[in-house]
Amino acid sequence: MQWNKSGFLVPAPGSPPGASFAQHCPFSPEAPNEDAIAGELFPAAPFADARIGRFEAAYVGHASEQPFRPNGSSGGLTSWVAAELLRTGVVDAVAHVAPTDPESGRHFAYRLSCSLEELNAGAKSRYYPVELSQVLGEIRATPGRYAVVGIPCFIKAIHLLKRVDPVIGDRVTHTLGLFCGHMKSAAMVESFAWQLGTELARVQALDYRIKNESRPANWYRTHLDLAGGGSAEQDWWHLADGDWGAGFLQNPACDWCDDVVAETADIAFGDAWVEPYSSDGRGTNVVIVRTPKLKALIERGRADGRLILEPVSADFIVKTQAAGLRHRRDGLAYRLSWHRSGIRAVKRVTPSAALPLRRKLVYRLRYAIARWSHPMLRLARACRNRAIYTLWARSALRLYQSVAWSRGRFGRLLDALLPPPERLS
């Protein structure tokens, strides 16, 4: 795999896909969808919901056992479950994303952790392009039982690969999913560095979400460690491209995904983006458990007092992810209705343009921002003038927020002409 011009990892030239590629690419129209895969994996699940899939139980809460909650971006439950699988001998190693030396050309990468110390060093959210080829090679080379942590499309890809690769099928025994809004380009790090008054080459490490117990959990703040011992940090909302919902530097594939909550994972974790949890700076998870064995593991943690969890309904989970689900349901249906040449995505959402005009404008603007942010950043880099990108991004953000949030004079004018959209965040 190698970087493309937009900061995404793509197959290197001379690496043609194999004959079975169309059957195990998660975005291929020829591959089974999430419903089909989950139906095979969790046939006896007592609950099935069109929005969050099949499941055994759902919870909201956090890990009370140290150091999982303080070390994580949210409630610490992803790391706790991965650690519990390791220390009870259920798996021999966990494949997860961890920081790496930027001299390698990447700030984060998948690795295999065989100890709790290694696992804890990889805690926290990483909105950075990664790929699985190296760890899959290590799994093929070393017999054992492995858990894989990943976003929905990665977990789906693992299950599709298990169908055609018997070694992976035998050795990957557990999948831990992460809820996903969309993924960002590696260029996001460069943009943040520019806006914090430094250069990408000086960034030695970064934290996309610093945890501060005195601030609401949804007040994202990024932190950069710089060469020479310095650092820089800033709240996302002060950054030109810091509005997550606007889609700056988004991976194009994310506009054609309909799985927010990792419906094919054995267990999946997200942030509890509803009050009172979103105001709790310590972080709170929502969890969807899809297998009886992992439900038993969770219940043992609750009984021991190591987990503080309350059972919740599918409707509660949906409320915590309302914005992402709208974008992957109503928004995806609208995008699927557009005329496009080439391969057309086949999704579980029916194409439809039956939306109010104002909401159509919101989705069109998100799509345009996601597409144009990449060439604008490249232009700024080529001209050695970061203002080309940041001024464009701030202008695009003002237009987007006027349409989506009725902000500014133009937003008020639009309100007089068109009913404001449902709050989309």
Regions found by a protein language model. Name each.
Residues 179-191, 211-215:
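Short, conserved secondary-structure transition motifs
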